Amino acid sequence: MAADYYQLLGVARDADKDEIKRAYRRLARKYHPDVNKEPGAEDKFKEINRAYEVLSEPETRARYDQFGEAGVSGAGAAGFQDFGDMGGFADIFETFFSGFGGMGGQQASARRRGPTRGEDLRLDLKLDFRDAIFGGEKEIRVTHEETCGTCQGSGAKAGTRPQTCTTCGGAGQVRRATRTPFGSFTQVSVCPTCEGSGQMIVDKCDDCGGAGRLRRPKKLKINIPAGVDSGTRLRVANEGDAGLRGGPPGDLYVYLFVSEDTQFRREGINLFSTVTISYLQAILGCSLEVATVDGPTELIIPPGTQPNAVLTVEGKGVPRLGNPVARGNLLVTIKVEIPTKISAEERELLEKVVQIRGDRAGKGGIEGFFKGVFGG
């Protein structure tokens, strides 16, 4: 399965264009082949470029968010971007050292953990073969974290409020100073009492136990676009876990797995099937009814059709994802059935045909006739 582009760039799914651009520039400098000579760096650089190529454009990003790689598989190639405005390498060092405490008494500013976006969820959904082709509405059931209705997500008992954390004084972080022969170092870490929120709950909500969220099942109706296939990913916005401390909810990602069909085989937007006809139908030609995903349709078998010939029924394949008006084709492989036993009258007639054609019949049979007709 292809790597997630957001994870490749190290950004959240709701990151804005500037955040994506900054992350891309930082990683591009790190893995650029002229700078990084380690094995695999060039491949990583190409992956980063591809991720930025997709996520930097609103249209391709929207398709990727809804369908995953399948929605952008035709959107350009993993080429290089313009690095003319990348500037110097100074911010690389800022990235390296910005997370550490200061030296010689200088300290990083404390940050309280604010609203946090809820976690994204994944649901694997098995689809019927024809449902994947034509799409439609599907009801699913998910279990996710919902904001507690009693405390409205605060985690505190009714009539009470969270209080300032006594461990960190509301900063959400604690500092520990260490003296060494090289100077003083300050280590900053998340407060273990309030877990970075800066607040602690003394009287916890009876329903959620102070968590601010409750795990609940939920039924959803989602729209399956026509033309999806195994591996297609659908994004259902805001149906992941509820956020913390007033943060937005995450998203639900539905990964589709399509069942196989007994009549048809699928490759992309084309369908394949097999039809068996008699040797006389192959020689003389005929019109017969064949099955399609839309229902029966007429197929013309031309005279002299050879075994394993492939005939095309246009427009009876799979709708193109994102453009259901455009459809693939149904390709029908023709199998010719040669009888193992024939009546005396049929044999007599066939032997006359052999004489007319001048074919040489095998001993006790008319193999030469069939070889002459079908090129065997």
Curated annotation (Swiss-Prot):
The J domain is necessary and sufficient to stimulate DnaK ATPase activity. Zinc center 1 plays an important role in the autonomous, DnaK-independent chaperone activity of DnaJ. Zinc center 2 is essential for interaction with DnaK and for DnaJ activity. Its main location: cytoplasm. Disulfide bonds: none annotated. GO terms for molecular function: ATP binding; heat shock protein binding; unfolded protein binding; zinc ion binding. It comes from Synechococcus sp. (strain ATCC 27144 / PCC 6301 / SAUG 1402/1). Zn(2+) 1 binds at C148, C151, C205, C208. GO terms for cellular component: cytoplasm. Residues 4-68 form the J domain. Belongs to the DnaJ family. Pfam families: DnaJ (PF00226), DnaJ_C (PF01556), DnaJ_CXXCXGXG (PF00684). The gene is dnaJ. GO terms for biological process: chaperone cofactor-dependent protein refolding; DNA replication; protein refolding; response to heat. PROSITE patterns: DNAJ_2, ZF_CR. Homodimer. It comes from the Bacteria. This is Chaperone protein DnaJ. Participates actively in the response to hyperosmotic and heat shock by preventing the aggregation of stress-denatured proteins and by disaggregating proteins, also in an autonomous, DnaK-independent fashion. Unfolded proteins bind initially to DnaJ; upon interaction with the DnaJ-bound protein, DnaK hydrolyzes its bound ATP, resulting in the formation of a stable complex. GrpE releases ADP from DnaK; ATP binding to DnaK triggers the release of the substrate protein, thus completing the reaction cycle. Binds 2 Zn(2+) ions per monomer. CDD domains: DnaJ, DnaJ_C, DnaJ_zf. Keywords: Chaperone, Cytoplasm, DNA replication, Metal-binding, Repeat, Stress response, Zinc, Zinc-finger. It is found in: Cytoplasm. Its cofactor is Zn(2+). Zn(2+) 2 binds at C165, C168, C191, C194.
